[in-house]
Amino acid sequence: ENKAEKHFSRKSGWLDLSRIRISVQYQKEWAQMFQESWRLQKEFFWTEDLSGVDWERVYQRYARLLPRIGSRSELSDLIWEMQGELGTSHAYEYGGDYPHAPRYPVGCLGADLVFDSKRRSWIFQKIYSGDIWKTNEHSPLAEPGVAVKEGDQLLAVGGVPVDEHKTPGELLVHQAGQFVPLTVIEGNQKKKGAKRKAKEARQIVVKTLFGEQKVRYREWVRNNVKTVESLTEGRVGYLHLPDMSTHGIAEFHRGYLAQVDREGLIVDARYNAGGMVSPLILEKLAHRHLGYDVPRWGSPESYPYHTLRGHLIVIANQFTGSDGDMFTTSFRQLQLGPLVGKRTWGGVIGIDGRYQLVDGTTTTQPQYSIWFHHAGWSVENHGVDPDIEVEDTPQSFIKNEDPLLARTVQEMLRLLKEKPVQSVSYSPSPRRLLPE
């Protein structure tokens, strides 16, 4: 077909759907959506009897509130409350025909800035380098040629001077992902007048970030690695599992392969958002060190390849959930090592999120439950209790302390003292002498 035949007309047969106007009676639409979400749970919940919940009675109880709904958000509240009667995790409702809220994307510099009242300027207190080789996952101030250091001063954003009243943040509103000129001066300069500052200042142009979560996450992980290495004199490794999906499996291999030869490994599963790759990670951790492949040229390699020879400890907290729950309870069942921290979230009935309501809302039906030999059905709605419970208080957060990691290192050092990991000591190589 050529372009002329695609024009909207009776001759072409193409209809311009954008000209169609539809009048929606929201009360009737919301009633239908409520009924549909109820029906989807009835048809797809993982047990036919919905774990004994009188689902017809639940519908009658909440349907009486439909005439009193006055907004789309109130419908969401009603669906959430109804699905909550199942007492089951992963029964969600999200999306739908909501009005678009105004957005004010702030351009991020991947740095902490503080105002210095003596120098009357903003100071780059901390610059988060992140992963310099990943686009949008490092501070733009760490780019080659920018040459901004911690302690340097920020004088202006986009040509507008900053002070205690005009902050960098407000000048970066609507500048996310944009090239923004910054006026900076070296931090080791003594207090000078405005004219002298202006003369010695220089202008740089950086492309701001849309957010700093990944940049700051990398800094947190690196600091934890350094802490563990320092406290154990390099004998113990550390890695973090942010989820059980693509990010999590990538982070696992990034940390695991670099530290697999240590005498111990701390696997931090705090804030693990779940996913589906826990069996792959458990398979790696469960492989035991059986021997070495010893070549003439090169270094000996563990057999099986990339297997641990030392102790394992997992850290978990109340934000470790879903496949994170399954990982921690399986770690215990396999007797790979102790669990340190807090009881996990407790939600292990899986979903696929394939069904949508008429306005695009997605509701999820808990369809895939799991039973463990050692725990039965008990992980759902309870979680996994740690072997060593440690409180993480607000006071610790304010002091920038990590009591869970500190207690884990303490436990690892105890294990290394009581059950030392033997260094490699080969027996003499066999002799193959010719017979006399």
Language-model segments: which ranges?
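Cleft-lining beta-strand/loop regions that shape enzyme active-site pockets
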Residues: Q27, K42-W46, D131-L141, L155, ...
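Hydrophobic alpha-helical and helix-loop surface patches within well-folded domains
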Residues: S9-R10, R57-V58, S71, K126, ...
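C-terminal, active-site-flanking charged/polar segments
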Residues: E1-R19, Q335-P338, R354-Q365, S369-H374, ...
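In a subset of proteins, long, contiguous C-terminal domains/tails are tracked
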Residues: D261-E263, Y292, F372-E436
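Extended, small/polar residue-biased N-terminal targeting/export presequences
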Residues: P67-I123, A201-V206, F210-N224, V409-E436
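PDZ/PDZ-like domain segments forming the peptide/carboxylate-binding groove
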Residues: Y104-E164, S245-T246, G321, Y368-S369
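Sequence signature of WD/YWTD-type beta-propeller architectures
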Residues: E1-E93, N224, G383
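A residue-level signal for conserved active-site and pocket-lining positions in enzyme catalytic cores
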Residues: S37, M82, L239, G376, ...
